[in-house]
Amino acid sequence: MIADPILAAIPWDQAATMIDLEGRVPIIGTIRDCAMHFVLYKPHARDNARVVLTQPIHRIGRQTRTWLLEPEEIAQLAERLRREAN
């Protein structure tokens, strides 16, 4: 089961953009596309990856919503994708 139920609610077909903090070319596609590409990244690139959402999500313990997913959250989505594919 995915650690964060908020991440589990993000649909695979939601539009998203994966960016790299080092300025590489972004991946524009869906959450599924971003999760698939994240798995292919080397550890250094994973640490610098972020996903910009088209719909903000709530954060536990915060009053505001966010448009950005951190590497740990992208890894959870990649794990969810792996489990659902099997």
Please give the residue ranges for each predicted region:
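Short aromatic-glycine-(Arg/Gly/Cys) micro-motifs in beta-strand/loop hairpins
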Residues: 2-22
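A generic structural signal for short, solvent-exposed coil/turn residues
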Residues: 10-11, 43-45
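A short, exposed loop/beta-hairpin motif centered on an aromatic-Gly-Thr core
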Residues: 21-29
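Short, surface-exposed secondary-structure junctions/capping segments
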Residues: 44-51, 82-86
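Short, structured protein-protein interaction patches enriched in aromatics and acidic/basic residues
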Residues: 47-70
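Helix-rich interaction surfaces within compact, conserved domain-sized segments
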Residues: 67-86
